[in-house]
Amino acid sequence: MSTGLRYKSKLATPEDKQDIDKQYVGFATLPNQVHRKSVKKGFDFTLMVAGESGLGKSTLVHSLFLTDLYKDRKLLSAEERISQTVEILKHTVDIEEKGVKLKLTIVDTPGFGDAVNNTECWKPITDYVDQQFEQYFRDESGLNRKNIQDNRVHCCLYFISPFGHGLRPVDVGFMKALHEKVNIVPLIAKADCLVPSEIRKLKERIREEIDKFGIHVYQFPECDSDEDEDFKQQDRELKESAPFAVIGSNTVVEAKGQRVRGRLYPWGIVEVENQAHCDFVKLRNMLIRTHMHDLKDVTCDVHYENYRAHCIQQMTSKLTQDSRMESPIPILPLPTPDAETEKLIRMKDEELRRMQEMLQRMKQQMQDQ
């Protein structure tokens, strides 16, 4: 027994370390290499905020990123708002936290939903999103692709008024016009105007109307099976809380001996970061801490790819039409397959299917052994 203990406590010799080094290739450091390169390069994120005036869009952005992007903003009178057309304003700021740099771009849409006639008031916004896709497509197709500036909109926070009974026609029109182009995250603005039971009813009504009108809002990705239980629980809470009921505030008030951001009312204090009062913390966690990269991935892999495929299809169609017009020899349509050819194709498909099934059975047998 004592010999075994002495053997277990034996220190590794230089020869043992050399043997370990020989077995170690080194590609396990790839995540660290990617991390260092990404941190050095920095990250960029473009967030669009949309909704009618007075719903606290700029205040919420300030609360999310602790950065004032609207220092030079001019407040318009009621008459100016009615006559104002929809504008697109960009605010860009560089934020650094613990050595990680983020280039944040906020795309604001003043004038949206404020006119008497709001027919297709979302057209300038959809045009802007398409213009960013077009610019990225041109840069990607050019000769110099090393430093492409990504100005594509990665997420749109759409503010819904808490004073209605669900979605208004302008809300439905906006989201249906953009849901195939950008990740839409609907928010119930100024949640402190409602009691908890009213918030629950409004959330349920909005979810029903989103399904009814076929609106595709941003869907949270499913958790992997190897994720820990805390992350799975957080993911479930996010999905159950959508659409998020939010409150924004730039004012620091004192509550229970602590200084917190919130709003002071005669009946009490509403704390922005108190999850019993609103979903601000859930929105911040989703947008910044857990799903920012997924929002960028969906923008690139789904929305932009759809736009890119459409552009390539149009270009191919135009080239085909031009070649038909310029060709001295008429291009005949391809002959339709006869019955014998179709029969042969079906036989080949059936043969291929049988081979695939046989390979699948062999693979299963090998796994069982």
UniProtKB/Swiss-Prot annotation:
GO function terms (MF aspect): GTP binding; GTPase activity; identical protein binding; molecular adaptor activity; structural molecule activity
Taxonomic superkingdom: Eukaryota
Residues recorded with modification Omega-N-methylarginine: 168
Modified residues (Phosphoserine): 225, 327
Post-translational modification: Phosphorylated by DYRK1A. In platelets, phosphorylated in response to thrombin, phorbol-12-myristate-13-acetate and collagen.
Ranges where the record places region G4 motif: 189-192
Entry's Gene Ontology cellular component terms: cell division site; microtubule cytoskeleton; plasma membrane; septin complex; septin ring; synaptic vesicle
Matches recorded under SUPFAM superfamilies: P-loop containing nucleoside triphosphate hydrolases (SSF52540)
The entry's keywords: Cell cycle, Cell division, Coiled coil, Cytoplasm, Cytoskeleton, GTP-binding, Methylation, Nucleotide-binding, Phosphoprotein
Organ and tissue specificity: Expressed at high levels in the CNS, as well as in heart and platelets (at protein level).
Gene Ontology biological process terms from the UniProt entry: adult behavior; cytoskeleton-dependent cytokinesis; protein localization; regulation of exocytosis; regulation of synaptic vesicle exocytosis; social behavior; synaptic vesicle targeting
Protein localization: Cytoplasm; Cytoplasm, Cytoskeleton
Region (G3 motif): 108-111
Positions that bind GTP: 51-58, 85, 111, 190-198, 248, 263
Coiled coil: 338-369
Family of this protein: Belongs to the TRAFAC class TrmE-Era-EngA-EngB-Septin-like GTPase superfamily. Septin GTPase family.
Comment field (misc): In a heterologous system, SEPTIN5 overexpression has been shown to exert dopamine-dependent neurotoxicity. As wild-type PRKN, but not familial-linked PRKN mutants, ubiquitinates mouse SEPTIN5 and promotes its degradation, it has been suggested that a deficiency in SEPTIN5 degradation may contribute to the development of early onset Parkinson disease 2 (PARK2).
Assembly, per entry: Septins polymerize into heterooligomeric protein complexes that form filaments, and can associate with cellular membranes, actin filaments and microtubules. GTPase activity is required for filament formation. Interacts with SEPTIN2 and SEPTIN5. In platelets, associated with a complex containing STX4. Interacts with PRKN; this interaction leads to SEPTIN5 ubiquitination and degradation. Interacts with DYRK1A. Interacts with STX1A; in the cerebellar cortex.
Name of this protein: Septin-5
Classification of source organism: Eukaryota, Metazoa, Chordata, Craniata, Vertebrata
Gene for this chain: SEPTIN5
